[in-house]
Amino acid sequence: LIRYMDVSETLANRIQNNLNDFFNYKQFCELLKTRELTQTRINRALLHIMLGLKKNNVREYMENGGHFYAKLLGFRKDRQDLLSIIAKKSALPLLTRLSDTDSISEIGQKMLRHDILASNLYQSVITDKYKTAFRNEYKQPMLKI
């Protein structure tokens, strides 16, 4: 467990020692919490475990520049002309569709997979909380206003 981001040896031991002693996420976090291990740190570490985000992944990302693409979430229709300018002048590949990943390095594609997994996890929480349909990141339309 200590290979994951934000998981110290102390937290890893507490996780392993309390794996069978809880009924839900909130109760598990309460079992893990100490004066030194805050709720926020525990949440962040457990999220990194769920996402499979390891320290060596982040080290690899940072050693290779940290940023590998810019994902366009939406734009104003009256400013659509700026998209081609941004795409031409940007040092990073501009993603308008997730299927257009050929221009991204292998490391960048790994980072994108982590981003998509995080987005899908977020969507599953939203789906459950608000009883809405799940919106897969690959099928998410670009916002045009």
Each predicted region: which residue ranges?
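Non-catalytic terminal extensions that flank enzyme cores
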Residues: L1-I145
